[in-house]
C-alpha cells in the first residue's frame, strides 16, 4: 500500500511540474511527461490507458519532427520500449499499429546503418507473436522474407542487435529441430566484452548449450559449462533456477 501511495505521490508531483512549466510548448518536457505517464499506467496495470498514452506519445513525435535527432535514435528507442511493453503483457493485437510507425521511420531515413538496425527491430516484433506461441512454420516464412533486407546486411548491425538476431534465429531452428543450423547461428553469437553482462548474453550461452547437446558436441558442452559456472560463481552475479537446471542436466 505504501509503495502504491508513493507512486501516486510521484505521479501527482510529475503532473504539477509539467503543468507549471508550460509543457504543451516544450517538446522535451511533454515527451518525458507522456513517457512517464505511459510507464506509470503500465506498471499500475491500467493497460488500456497506458496504450492511449503510448499513442499520444507517438503522435507527439510525429507532430514535432523538427526536434528529432538525425538519425532519429530516440524515437526508435521509444517505439522499442512501447513494443516491449505490449509484448510483456501479451497485447499482440496492438503491436501492428506501432510496427506501421516503425516501417514509416525506416522508409523515411537515409542512413543504411540506422535502416538495418531498425529493420532488425521490425523483424523481431513481427516474429514474436509467432515465436512466443511456437508457430515455427510462420517464423521460418518470416525469416525468408527478411533475407535480403536484414540477414544479407547483418554486418551493419550493432553488437546487441546482431546477438538478438542470431539468438532468435537459433530458437526458430531449434523449434524446427534443425539442430545443425541452430548450432551454426548460435556459434556465431560473439560474447562481446562490452555487453557480456547483459541478460541477453546469458540467454545466448544457455541456448548454445542446448544446441551443442542436440548435436552431441559433448566436449564443447564441458568447455562452455565450465565457463558459465565460473562466471556464475562471482558474488556479483545473480543466478536463476533455469541456469542451474541446464548446467546440472
Q: What label would you give each PLM region?
A:
Residues 1-21, 28, 233-249:
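Amphipathic helix-loop-helix modules that constitute alpha-helical solenoid scaffolds
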Residues 12-22, 55-67, 99-111, 141-155, ...:
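Amphipathic alpha-helical segments of tetratricopeptide repeats
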Residues 24-31, 66-77, 109-123, 153-165, ...:
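Alpha-solenoid helical repeat architecture
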Residues 32-36, 74-84, 118-128, 132, ...:
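"A position-specific structural signal for the A-helix of alpha-solenoid helical repeats
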Residues 173-247:
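C-terminal structural cap/anchor segments
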